[in-house]
Structures are given as structure tokens and as C-alpha cells.
Amino acid sequence: MAIQSADHIPILDIGAFLSGDESTAIEVASQLRWIQEEIGFYYIVNHGLSAELIQRAIEQVRGLHSLPMADKLKLKVDEDTTGYVPINSTIYVTTDAGDNDQYDLNENYRIVRERKADHPSIQAGRRFTGPNKWPPQDLLPDFKSTMLEYYNAMENLGRALLPLYARALDLAPDYFDELFTDPTWLTRNVHYPAAPAKDNQFGISPHTDHGFITLLPVSKVPGLEVKTQTGEWMTGDYVEGAMIVNSGDFMQKWTNGRFIATPHRVLAPKEERYISAFFFNPNWDVRSEPLPSCVSAEAPAQFDVTTFHEHLCNYVDRNYSKSSGGQADEQTSDPAVS
């Protein structure tokens, strides 16, 4: 199946590839290469995650955001950058995709990869590596177990996609394996309230994601819009059972601009919208030197080199307010909107 139109978000069927049919790998990688160079967004179908597990996870996210504000604020994000992020906490400034001057109309709960207390990153106090803040079991008895089950499945899917990305970049299929041994993935478990938006205010304002790739199960509640390279905003359709995948800023740096980080936004919905976005990223100390297939005398390196951790800290500190795990200047927030 040829995918050669940039006026809609394409659908990539990865079922045969995930089942081990190597004969499909070259064709699927070729499709992925075109998508990542021209659009940066796509749907995957036959991805292996059950609809039942995804629904259970979304119901837990709904339950968490339905807690009284006093309970949510006890779990508020701090210097460890995990936990509850109130509404009116982000204005995205790390992109020129929009003239963002209003705080976003969403509240979210940030969870990172679960690590033991003696993990070197925990011991070092490294941001975005934990420990997580879990709601008390007497309030949400199944939250932790359900979300860990869901995140484990999402991590497995992210790992399964690595050989496909390697092939798409003309690298050995196992190229990324040693760079994702302890991935710095994080999640945003978001509630977009059905609240009136001000002028130039969004559920989430125009931005590009921070990392390698983002995995997001589709929502029946519309709102996602993706900016094409011609500057038009196209609406993300609902594709039954699909997952949205897009690349972020670190991918763009790592590929020396070859695989693009595409601006997108979410309009304030007319009904409550709940999602769980999974940001699949490499080990914290992976550096953004251009990948071997993405740099040459004709295509010299064009971005400053950082570790992934440095890149992530810069992204969050510039886009998130000081009371929400970042360093951006504060604007009066209204935690009553939930």
C-alpha cells in the first residue's frame, strides 16, 4: 500500500511486521520514512494493545481527575516532576507554531517509568526518573496496577517500533537497542474540561512534543489538529482501534532535521476529554549527535548537541510554570476548573 499524500494523517498497518513477518519490514519502513519526512504524524493499526486495557486505563485517568481538588493537590507535581499538574500551568514557548499567550485548558497527571528506590537515577535525584506519586489505594484502589499494566504494554510497543525506525533511517535493525535499556519515558494523563476558552486559548496550545516518539490511543472526543508543512491545520479523524504516533524535538535533532517534529494543538472540547499520552524516549544520557545516516559533508550537523535529559529539562522549564515542575513565570491559575 503506497502512502504518498500529505493532506491527511496516514494509517500504517504494522500487524504483519509485529507478528514477525520480515518480508513486510522493508515496505513498512519505507512508508514510515516518507511519513516522518513529510508529515511527522500517523495512525498505527493492529498494534497489539487490547481495546479493553486502553479503556481501563482511560477510566482510571477519569477517576483520578474526578477526585476532589484537595486530594489532587496533595499529589501536586514538585521538583521530582511527577504528580498532578493543575489547569493553567503551561504556555508553550519552545515552538513558533503559534502566538501562545494563554494558559492551556487542561489538567494532567505526570507519571514516569517506575524505578526502585535504589536505582542510580533515583539516588542521584535526577528529574523525570521518579519516584512516582501514586494516589492512595483507598481513593483509587486499581489505579496503580492498571496504569503500570498499560504503561508496560506501551513500553513494549515502543520497543517493537525501534527496529522499524532503524530500518527507516538506513541503520541496523538493532541500532537503538542499547540506547533504550532504561528509557526515560513519561506520561501525561490529561483531562480537557468542557470549559469555555478565551481568545487564542486551547486545550493545549500549538506545540511540538519534546522527545523521540509519542504514542496516543485515539479518543472519540475530537480536538486534535496537526499543522502541515504548508501551514494548514488538518483535523485528526477518529480511527477505530488506532493509536496516533508522532515524532518530537529530540527525534528531529537526532536525525539532523530529517524526521520532523510536527506542530499540533488540541481545541477546547465541547465534552469532557480524557487521554493518556506516552512519550517514549531513550536513556537519559543519550546524546543528540546526528545519527550516522543523517549527517554528511552535504548535510552538516545543524543542532546543538545535548543529552536527552538536558533537552527534556530545558523543554519543561521553559513551558511549565514554577509551581508545576518548570521554571516559567507564573500567571494566576484557577484550580477550581476541573
Tell where the protein language model's regions lie, with residue ranges.
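Peripheral, non-catalytic segments flanking oxidoreductase cores
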Residues: 1-338
